Amino acid sequence: MDRRDFLKTLAVTGAVMTVQRSEAMDILAQKLTNAGGGKVDLVAVMGGEPEAMFRRAITEMGGMKQFIKPGQKVVVKPNIGWDKVPELAGNTNPKLVAEIVKQCLAAGAKEVTVFDHTCDDWQKCYKNSGIEEAAKAAGAKVMPAHLESYYKPVSLPKGVRMKSAKVHEAILNSDVWINVPILKNHGGA
């Protein structure tokens, strides 16, 4: 599938999901059980404070120790792209980031680093989003991603068109990478 076909498919899917949003929300709100008793790899939790919802979801998935082993270096990459206060919900919720950091450390992580490549001024984004303060208070190291010097070239031998990429050193030096986007439900998402 080429990029144009992918974008068309994505647009049609988005339109269908917008029309069927209420049906999709009904599906997500259902109480489902793990009838087979196997390992769960997807959990949807709705309603409540972000940190409580995360605790519930990670417990359903077997706990953070399923993903973090003692001594590992962890990168938590939230969305800190915008110079917005938490009340505007433009970035990942700082309470959620703090809870994930705490859970990683409780599972035995050697260190947890939090960073994002921001769209607005990184220092304002980190501060005004509340994520810098929350992450540090939870025990994480916070680092920027705005300088080219943070990125190292990586070969992509199986790439069809892209044969190399520059990857942030925090990711290259980590054992575990946790992406924590902000969930969006607007048409631009």
Question: Which residues does each PLM region occupy?
Answer:
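N-terminal and secondary-structure boundary signal
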Residues: M1-A189
